[in-house]
């Protein structure tokens, strides 16, 4: 005996909401699937990237002017000499976390002027 798709849809249309929820749970258990909507993938990531309001400033490498980069890190973060040196020596390292676009751009400019390679995330 074969049941058509229309027969199934008509049967579901006659069910109460509670019965439909129970049917969905039964499908999930029987077939090992989830009724959750599939993620939209890269399109969602692109929208999120456009809406980003907070940035992390990442020091990728100090370059040849390490002393100037340490001074720039101290200026931007308020860290002591030892702590700033540890950040620079530990590159790649996060210099600033969750700052505005303007602050991140200014920090990047200061660090690059000092000779560092910098990335905003």
Swiss-Prot record:
Pfam family, one: Ribosomal_L12_N
CDD domains assigned to the protein according to its UniProt record, in alphabetical order: Ribosomal_L7_L12
Gene Ontology BP annotations: translation
Domain of life: Bacteria
This protein's UniProt keywords: Ribonucleoprotein, Ribosomal protein
UniProt-recorded Gene Ontology molecular function terms: mRNA binding; structural constituent of ribosome
Purpose: Forms part of the ribosomal stalk which helps the ribosome interact with GTP-bound translation factors. Is thus essential for accurate translation.
Subunit annotation: Homodimer. Part of the ribosomal stalk of the 50S ribosomal subunit. Forms a multimeric L10(L12)X complex, where L10 forms an elongated spine to which 2 to 4 L12 dimers bind in a sequential fashion. Binds GTP-bound translation factors.
NCBIfam families recorded: L12 (TIGR00855)
Family: Belongs to the bacterial ribosomal protein bL12 family.
Record protein name field: Large ribosomal subunit protein bL12
Species whose genome carries this gene: Pseudomonas fluorescens (strain SBW25)
């Amino acid at each position: 005996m074969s049941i058509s798709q229309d027969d199934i849809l008509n049967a579901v249309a006659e069910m109460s909401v509670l019965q439909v929820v129970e049917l969905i749970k039964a499908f999930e258990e029987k077939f090992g699937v989830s009724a959750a909507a599939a993620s939209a993938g890269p399109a969602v990531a692109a929208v999120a990237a456009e809406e980003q309001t907070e940035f992390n400033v990442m020091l990728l490498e100090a370059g040849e002017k390490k002393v100037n980069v340490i001074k720039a890190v101290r200026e931007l973060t308020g860290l002591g000499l030892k702590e700033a040196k540890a950040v620079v020596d530990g590159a790649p390292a996060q210099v600033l976390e969750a700052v505005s676009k303007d602050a991140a751009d200014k920090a990047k400019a200061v660090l690059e002027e000092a000779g560092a390679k910098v990335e905003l995330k």
